[in-house]
Structure formats: structure tokens, C-alpha cells
Amino acid sequence: MVKDKAMSALLPLLVAAPAVTGFAGYFAREIRGPQPPPVATPTAPPPGRPRVEFFDVAELTSTDARGFIRPVDRYEVQPWGLYLARTVGARARYEECWLLPEPGVRATVAHDSPGHHRSHDYVLDIVEVERIGPKRWRATDCFLDVAVRRGRSATLLGAGELLAAHAAGHLDTASADRMFERAAAVLDGLAAHDHDVERWLRARDIALTWM
């Protein structure tokens, strides 16, 4: 009986032990026995800034947001935009892109190395594309992407990153609104053309060619 009364008096202390300081907390933790160390909560990476990339047609190079200069195999300038083909990434993936100032997207087809397969056919990055010289272009990527499975679906990605960048002051409200409106227009256009990127762009008098 005495033992039961003692344990009943200790139970609240045992429960509260992690938050109790001084001798009471010390003895409560001793009674409970050793506890596993607290698990560190992973911290989210800081919000990023819009990624700016430059394309030098004369030099056959591109310069990414970190300042790395990479070779480009081929450029082609058309009235509706700029085409480029290049090798990117550690897996030596081959990539073809069209930078399209109107409707404000970068359309990418990636040719993966053997053993790697993507679940989508196109990625449409929502971007600001500007021609800043006779042979020089700039694309500003504000995080939103649309992954397209031809004839099946279009999925918006990156909204959380854009909102985090806006909250951190890296992107003003007008720019964030413009990116979301542009993404909505892309999704609506694709839905109206059976999720076919080529058909949607042809309806806008944009004819893409690929390797």
C-alpha cells in the first residue's frame, strides 16, 4: 500500500520530468532512467532568389545563376524565340530548350542517359525572357514549372518556393502575381488543347522544332 501511494505521488512528476528543473527534475529523470537524445529537426533551406541565366549566341555559351559558363552545342533564333541544345548535369543529360518571350515560358525536352527515365514529356518553366542584345538573351526563372505528360496531364510545381521567395523579399507582389497568372494561362491553354504542348503553341503561331 505504501509503495502504491508513493508511485501515485511520483506519476505527475515522471510525466513532467522533461520540463522540471532543479532537484525534483533530477530525481524524476533518474527514476525514469536514461532517455534517448532529442532528435534534431531538419531545417528547411533558406528561400532562394529568382534564377537568372544568360545565353550568348555568338560565343555558344550559357552562364547560369552561379556564374558558371557552360558550352552550348547549338543556338537557333526564330521570330518567336531562341532554341538551344546542350549537355547538362552530372548524368550528362542532353537537353533541348525553347525560350519563348510570349507566352513567357522555357519549354524543355530532356534526353536522359540510359537507365534514367522521366515521368513527363516536357517541362515548361514560367520565366521572363528578354533579348538584351543582338546575340544575347536573358531568362529569369521564378520557380514555377509545369510538368506535362503529353495527352494526359499538366502539373504545376514550385508554388511553395515562389511564395517563400516572396515572403523573404526576393520577389515583389506584382512579379509573384504575374508568375501565377502566367502559369494559370499555360494550364488553361494546355487543357484546351488536350495537354499537347505543340498544338497549344501552334495555336499561338509558334512552331517548335526538335532534334
Model-identified regions with their sequence ranges:
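Short, well-ordered loop/turn elements at secondary-structure boundaries
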Residues: 78-79, 117-118, 149-150
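Hydrophobic residues embedded in beta-strands of well-ordered beta-sheets
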Residues: 81-83, 105-106, 154
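Cysteine/selenocysteine-centered motifs that mediate thiol-based redox chemistry or coordinate metal-sulfur cofactors
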Residues: 182-211
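Well-ordered beta-strand positions
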Residues: 75-77, 99, 147-148
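A hydrophobic, small-residue-rich beta->alpha segment in the mid-to-C-terminal subdomain
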Residues: 142-186
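Structured beta-strand/loop patches that form or line metal/cofactor-binding pockets in enzymes
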Residues: 87-144
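Charge-rich, low-complexity N-terminal segments
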Residues: 2-95
